[in-house]
Curated annotation (Swiss-Prot):
The chain crosses the membrane at residues 4-24, 28-48, 60-80. NDH-1 is composed of 14 different subunits. Subunits NuoA, H, J, K, L, M, N constitute the membrane sector of the complex. It is found in: Cell inner membrane. The lineage of its organism: Bacteria, Pseudomonadati, Pseudomonadota, Alphaproteobacteria, Hyphomicrobiales. One of its GO terms (biological process) is ATP synthesis coupled electron transport. Its EC number is 7.1.1.-. This is NADH-quinone oxidoreductase subunit K 2. GO terms for cellular component: NADH dehydrogenase complex; plasma membrane. It is a multi-pass membrane protein. GO terms for molecular function: NADH:ubiquinone reductase (non-electrogenic) activity; quinone binding. The gene is nuoK2. NDH-1 shuttles electrons from NADH, via FMN and iron-sulfur (Fe-S) centers, to quinones in the respiratory chain. The immediate electron acceptor for the enzyme in this species is believed to be ubiquinone. Couples the redox reaction to proton translocation (for every two electrons transferred, four hydrogen ions are translocated across the cytoplasmic membrane), and thus conserves the redox energy in a proton gradient. It comes from Rhizobium meliloti (strain 1021).
Length: 100
């Protein structure tokens, strides 16, 4: 069995990498992938704590997060396709101006 602190360390490392990608990158696709990395790091911690406390609720909550994330990715990729067709760019700075 893997010690709890290894799982927490992995989750924190992935969270920091994902947060860095969200805050530092200007490509919307990279930001979306970094956001997915953030959510998966949270899932690792849910499962690790569920295993440590011998409770299945951590795994159930991780499954719900995965389902919600799948829906979020589907919507975000649809928006990205529409954005590329209209603006021909994926830069965050070029998309911030909203016109009616």
């Amino acid at each position: 069995m893997v010690p709890l602190w290894w799982s927490i360390l992995l989750g924190v490392a992935l969270f920091v990498i994902g947060a860095g990608g969200v805050l530092l990158r200007r490509n919307i696709l990279i930001v979306l992938m970094s956001l997915e990395l953030l959510l998966n790091s949270v899932n690792i911690n849910f499962i690790a704590f569920g295993q440590y406390y011998d409770d299945f609720r951590g795994q159930i909550f991780a499954i719900f997060v995965i389902a919600i994330t799948a829906a979020e990715v589907a919507v975000a990729l649809g928006i990205l396709v529409a954005l590329v067709r209209n603006k021909s760019t994926l830069k965050v700075d070029d998309v911030t101006i909203m016109k009616g």
